[in-house]
A protein has these predicted regions:
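Generic recognition of well-ordered alpha-helical segments
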Residues: 13, 17, 36-40, 61, ...
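Short, basic (Lys/Arg/His-rich) helix/loop patches that form interaction surfaces
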Residues: 75, 140, 144-145, 157, ...
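N-terminal core-binding DNA-recognition domain of tyrosine site-specific recombinases/integrases
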Residues: 4-7, 19-102, 106-108, 124, ...
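Basic, Lys/Arg- and aromatic-enriched nucleic-acid-binding interface segment
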Residues: 72-75, 82-86, 90-92, 105, ...
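C-terminal secondary-structure termini that scaffold catalytic or DNA-interacting sites
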Residues: 176, 189, 194-211, 215-223, ...
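A short, basic/aromatic helix-end/turn motif that makes direct DNA contacts
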Residues: 166-172, 307-313, 323
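Catalytic-site neighborhood detector that most strongly recognizes the C-terminal catalytic loop/helix
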Residues: 121, 129, 185, 310-336
């Protein structure tokens, strides 16, 4: 037995107490993430085991299973290989550490068995953007104009999938070429965007995004305006917002049981189908966001500008996520510099007379 517990609780009971208090501290989306991660871990560690019986050896065994074992995929998800990345496993273990530390802080456990366990070493996953040719094939493979418009807006703005689902015409000013991101769709409810920096951010639209939105305007701009409840970060608070959804299943649905707006799962399925029809290498739909960032960086956009567009607090996140990708694309940067700077270079003589 590891340490002396003041009150014997199963690991499930301890986790439930931890989550109950977290409910008032974090946004609903974050709470759902906590719950999902802890549920996965409990299925491995054994929810009926006493929390006080979990030792370092058991935790290392759990970590190994997370790293190498098969995971149960969500509905319609494609799992290409067993295990999880080191970054994901470290995130899971951090959540479990928080549960045990909660137990120590509140007198349920005498000590935290995580002492002496260091995070796994691992590199961040390198973004895997679409090439221009792949993107054209993807768009050509879309079966209706709305799908083409949706993926053009996604790739040329870099907004998150949930933000795309929750986008309303009230948020868009095509005359000034701007879009305000006010909300996100998480699970079955509307929330504020994932980060504080991403909330009410103004996205400056480039021409391909404007063209796609003008095309979509003919399909949905005059549709029904909805009054929706948006859950704020402060516990229990909501705000009513007007929203005429930009992308609507009704426009392209082949069946009648559609909702007023797309879900993250439904646009992911749309992506997977288009990727398969296009005959391009499979990627997750979130790579549409990475494609925007990578294309923008290659085009010479300021990382701080890209960070603002994508809802990051500062350019540091851009360097963290895309730094390795940027270093592996130095040739593109050299080409860009040659294009942009060569015209300003003075003409240099190359005859033998100058060599002295």
């Amino acid at each position: 037995k590891f340490g002396e517990a003041r009150q014997d609780l199963t690991i499930k009971e301890l986790a439930e107490k931890f989550l109950a208090l977290k409910e008032t501290e974090v946004a609903k989306t974050s709470l759902n993430t906590y719950r999902a991660v802890i549920k996965n871990i409990l299925s491995i560690i054994g929810e009926k085991n006493l929390a006080s019986s979990i030792n370092k050896e058991k935790l290392l065994a759990v970590r190994k299973e997370l790293l190498t074992g098969y995971q149960i995929p969500k509905s319609n998800y494609i799992v290409t290989q067993p295990g999880r990345s080191a970054v994901t496993v470290n995130n899971y273990m951090t959540n479990l550490y928080a549960v045990f530390q909660f137990g120590v802080d509140n007198g349920y456990l005498a000590d935290n068995p995580f002492k002496g366990i260091s995070p796994l070493k691992g590199s961040r996953t390198i973004p895997d953007p679409l090439s221009r040719e792949e993107f054209i094939r993807l768009i050509d493979a879309c079966r209706n104009q709305q799908a083409k418009n949706l993926w053009c807006v996604s790739v040329y703005t870099g907004i998150r999938p949930g933000e795309l689902c929750a986008l309303g015409w009230e948020d868009i000013d095509l005359k000034n070429g701007t879009m305000i991101i006010r909300r996100n769709l998480a699970k079955d409810r509307f929330t504020v965007p994932k980060t504080q920096a991403g909330t009410n951010r103004v996205i400056h639209l480039i021409k391909p995004a404007i063209d796609a939105l003008r095309s979509q305007m003919a399909l949905t701009r005059l549709s029904k305006e909805h009054i929706i409840d948006v859950h704020l970060r402060e516990f229990g608070r909501t705000e009513k917002q007007k929203c005429t959804f930009v992308f609507q299943p009704e426009v392209s649905a082949k069946v009648k049981n559609y909702g007023d707006h797309f879900t993250v799962d439904s646009i992911r399925q749309m992506w997977d189908a288009a990727v398969k029809r296009a005959g391009i290498r499979h990627r997750k739909s979130y790579q549409s966001r990475h494609t925007y960032a990578c294309w923008s960086l290659t085009a010479g956009a300021n990382p701080a500008f890209i960070a603002n567009q994508m809802g990051h607090a500062d350019a540091q996140m851009v360097f963290q996520v895309y730094g390795k990708w940027m270093s592996e694309n130095n040739n593109a940067q050299v080409t860009l510099l040659n294009t942009q700077l060569s015209e300003f270079a003075p003409t240099m003589p190359h005859n033998e007379a100058m060599k002295s």
